Regions:
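Glycine-rich flexible loops
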Residues: 1-185
Length: 185
């Protein structure tokens, strides 16, 4: 992992970066590094604690966005209906971008714009970005989406016993969370 992964600290002046770990033996930054930086800027404007930006390529999340409409509220609702943990972990929902050319400034700008509203942004047919105050928080967000997408895909959206909206609403109330407006019926 030290060749293909890296941990970078951005200087307090915002113009310098320091490699703390990784990219050994000729490893280099991903082509999506500019997207990471733009996402950092957007999330830090929303929450100063969100200093972690993580990008992964989770199989079931990618599979789910190939069979579901690219509608953020519908996609979020399907996740919330599949796992009671989902609304608790990401009550703000999941942002979605259409299929775009990765590694470009265009997708970076679009991702950064979504990051102003969402902590999670799915890149259709590619992967997901998650943010948080810690590595555990960012990974936990992504892992919860992936686990829930796996449940959805294993049932191919034909589950009979989905979680009703009143239960999702009750979970949100119990945990003092505000679900993304317009998702619950």
């Amino acid at each position: 992992p030290e060749t293909n992964l890296g941990i970078v600290r951005i200087g307090t002046d915002g113009t310098t970066a320091e490699l703390l770990w990784g990219f050994k033996d000729g490893g280099k930054f991903t082509s999506e590094f500019p997207t990471h930086m733009m996402s950092h800027i957007s999330r830090l404007e929303v929450d100063k604690k969100h200093r972690i930006v993580m990008h992964t390529h989770p199989t079931y999340t990618i599979a789910m966005n190939t069979v579901c409409p690219l509608d953020e509220k519908d996609f979020t609702h399907k996740l919330w209906q599949s796992n009671t943990e989902a609304v608790i972990v990401f009550p703000d929902g999941v942002g979605i971008l259409p299929c775009m050319i990765c590694g470009t400034n265009e997708i970076g700008i679009e991702t950064a714009e979504k990051m102003k509203k969402f902590r999670l942004v799915v890149w259709t047919n590619h992967g997901i970005y998650g943010t948080g105050a810690t590595m555990d928080e960012a990974f936990g967000l992504i892992e919860t989406v992936e686990k829930t997408a796996q449940i959805y895909m294993l049932t191919l959206g034909k589950a009979v016993n989905i979680i009703p909206d009143d239960i999702i609403r009750g979970l949100a109330e119990l945990w003092n969370l505000k679900p993304l407006d317009g998702v619950l019926k």
